[in-house]
Amino acid sequence: MTNIRKSHPLFQNLNDSLIDLPAPSSISSWWNFGSLLGICLAIQILTGLFLAMHYTSDTTTAFQSVTHICRDVNYGWILRYLHANGASMFFICLFLHVGRGLYYGSYIYKETWNVGVILLFAVMATAFMGYVLPWGQMSFWGATVITNLLSAIPYIGTNLVKWIWGGFSVDKATLTRFFAFHFVLPFIISALFLVHLLFLHETGWNNPTGIPSDSDMIPFDPYYTIKDMLGALAMVLALLMVVLFSPDVLGDPDNYIPANPLNTPPHIKPEWYFLFAYAILRSIPNKLGGVLALVLSILILILMPLLHTSKQRSMMFRPLSQCMFWLLVADLLTLTWIGGQPVEHPFIIIGQLASILYFLLILVLMPITSIVENHLLKW
């Protein structure tokens, strides 16, 4: 008799995706982050669901409802901090996942890559709207500044901003709709996640060498289930360390001050995971130019398959391209640091140079380096 997991229509897909899935024998720990992102999403949906039971999306009570969750609800404090720091863990895994894709040439699978870029945008939108919900000073002013950027769109900009706000400023209508979108978007992300997996299983997995591994496959279970469980254990341990020992280390102290439209904080900045894009936005003196650069800093990932000029897929055997890749990583870390600094000398010029280098590396230097390597290898 056939095993039920192989014959039952409900379990068949799960079996083909998680148990009998053929996987390359050479994939390293850099391939763990896909499963970690799935776990992060599950943590965020579960903690978010329980937080939503106690949260009120009204400007007069939102801040108090978050305080109530932390003080009066049973284990409300751990739910709140798991959710807030879980978002940071989500983005750490996300950036490492994208970085691995860039390093090992995973973007050659165009459909999987493009769905991944859409997922990145969806997660960023969800995180931004979630940051507005506690209705602290940084929530309010962050929402005001970022939504105001849409007014840079010619002709329709001003009306578009008022339409998103639901009035003439960020107020009750804005908070209510942001809560609604923040609640529904994770489920849309879950659907996109399944589409991402669907395309991945159509093509099969890449591996560190970038060479097709059809002749050397092993079943996903037990080898990679154990490996993923170890990664998940390490991630949950790191998350709990932050939540239980220093839950506010990644937050902004200004967000413990209730939102006040009459008092602007001295330095408005988003959460740490948006700082690199925020630094690029600020480095351009023109409003529309800054907004375009902000969008392109993420959208540029769509162009990666077109910018791939190397005859090899992976960077594993390409030392010059590796130098360029790590220069890009260093540049992004510099941008993250600059995004958290005030707009004054010397941070302005450092941010501008780092922004130019970011686009220069991706659009010019990395493709040229790949062509040089092809010639050096006489390909």
Swiss-Prot record:
It is a multi-pass membrane protein. PROSITE patterns: CYTB_CTER, CYTB_NTER. Heme b b566 binds at residues 97, 196. The chain crosses the membrane at residues 33-53, 77-98, 113-133, 178-198, 226-246, 288-308, 320-340, 347-367. It comes from the Eukaryota. Belongs to the cytochrome b family. The cytochrome bc1 complex contains 11 subunits: 3 respiratory subunits (MT-CYB, CYC1 and UQCRFS1), 2 core proteins (UQCRC1 and UQCRC2) and 6 low-molecular weight proteins (UQCRH/QCR6, UQCRB/QCR7, UQCRQ/QCR8, UQCR10/QCR9, UQCR11/QCR10 and a cleavage product of UQCRFS1). This cytochrome bc1 complex then forms a dimer. This is Cytochrome b. It comes from Pteropus speciosus (Philippine gray flying fox).
